[in-house]
Amino acid sequence: MQPCACVAHVSTRKVEYMFLPKLKFLHHLLKALVAPCRTAQPGAFSALALLHRCGAVVLLGVVTLHAAAQQDPAFAHYWQLEPQLNPATVGRTPQLNIAAALQMHAAGYEDGGSTMYAGADMAFQIGKTRHGVGAIFQNDEFGLFSHKRFSVQYAYHLKLWGGTLSIGAEADMLNESVQGSKADLGDANDPAFPSTDLSGSKFDASVGVYYAHRHWYAGLAAQHLTAPTVFLGETNEYKVKRLYNFIGGYNIKLRNSFFTIAPSTLLRYDGSAFRADITARVLYEHQKRRLYAGLTYSPQHSVTGFVGGSFHGVDLSYSYEANTSGMGLGAGQHEITLGYRLDLKLGKKGKNLHRSVRYL
């Protein structure tokens, strides 16, 4: 009989609850290692030696993943979901913009988790001043953990230096929850993990600035300004880190062609972990139809391929993010993004509030 890789009693007490929600690989590792123990016969392995071995593996996974992971979800189609990153981007175009995205994590793994995003924003004009409002809902689930965010956003848009300067702010309600009643850790009395369902909420805030010129754009935002600590019961807590991000891009229109090259980048830093997404897209646009494809490279994280298009105001795109570390290429993320734009006649008729240089 093969040795049983049992970690039912590994020192999970050393793993702080605040780190658990993002340790996706650890979750699957624990589940895979615990399962064989349920059918193992006594004496089939040396418990003490195995405990030390498994404990080292688990703690190594904890340290590695915590050092590399950020708390907020990373969408592959970040240029389509800019309000998720920066409140200054709401109301930048004269249409009502509706966007939704679904990301499935850890392909091939049971309970790999998913992230859902839904948002809408619109522009309006008061006198000669231009404004934007929006709202988003986001639900990030992984195993027994759930992270929800509801935000209302406002932006002020000002013509400046031949482009548009936008300043935005948002108010957030964060909710963290864990289904402790569904946990199967072998030891029902283990105090390291809650045995009942717990949840907690806290208010938060974010701010951002964004500048768009004819062919290029750039934005900077600070999220989770209050860095709240969400309490779940009396003994568990989840500490939210401040997150700073920069987004920028340039549209290069090829001469005598329907093609545009649109490089862009997204940089994120939360005080301990840094992530850079470097994207190259090729767009074909003709007779109100737009098709695009491209690649994103995130050093030490992943490579993403995507394809999509726009038809009569409806945007549909798909991507697959292959991990270059951790669980490997086959355990990546599938993502589908859907968008819709509806023309609104607010403010002065016949005049667009401002044009967007961002290609969806």
List the predicted regions and their residue ranges.
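Cleavable N-terminal export/targeting peptides
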Residues: M1-D72, D343-L360
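Subset of outer-membrane beta-barrel
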Residues: Q70-L360
